[in-house]
């Protein structure tokens, strides 16, 4: 299979709209809570790290791992996105990741899966 430039990780893309939200977690939470209020009737999913477990609710929350182990996050990302497909989620909001070393590879895959849909807070 041949990929056009920038499409290498498009196979990561979920069926749902994926939005990466950049900013500290309090801003992330405020943004998502507002969006949930505007998305009546839509199933909302969240991609979070273990550090934020229990800090926000949605129809479906998936944890990719701890920020202390980007290896785990990289390993879990694809499976997490597929689980959202299985649960018919409409919109997914994801935390962003530090773009140093392995974090850059994670963000590269996530950004392409999101179709470059990034909100900077």
Residue positions per predicted region:
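Short, small-residue-biased leader/transition segments that mark boundaries at the very start
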Residues: 1-2
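A C-terminal functional module that forms or caps the active site or interfaces directly
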Residues: 6-115
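Short, flexible loop segments at boundaries between secondary-structure elements
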Residues: 118-121
């Amino acid at each position: 299979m041949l990929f056009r430039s920038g499409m290498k990780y498009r196979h990561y893309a979920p069926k749902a709209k994926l939005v990466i939200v950049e900013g500290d977690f309090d801003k992330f939470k405020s943004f998502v809570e507002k969006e949930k209020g505007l998305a009546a009737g839509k199933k909302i999913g969240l991609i979070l790290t273990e550090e934020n477990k229990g800090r926000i609710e949605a129809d479906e929350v998936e944890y990719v791992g701890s920020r202390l182990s980007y290896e785990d996050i990289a390993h879990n990302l694809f499976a997490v996105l597929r689980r959202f497909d299985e649960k018919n989620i409409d919109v997914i909001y994801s935390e962003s990741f530090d773009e140093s070393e392995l974090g850059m590879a994670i963000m590269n895959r996530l950004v392409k899966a999101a179709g470059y849909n990034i909100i900077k807070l």
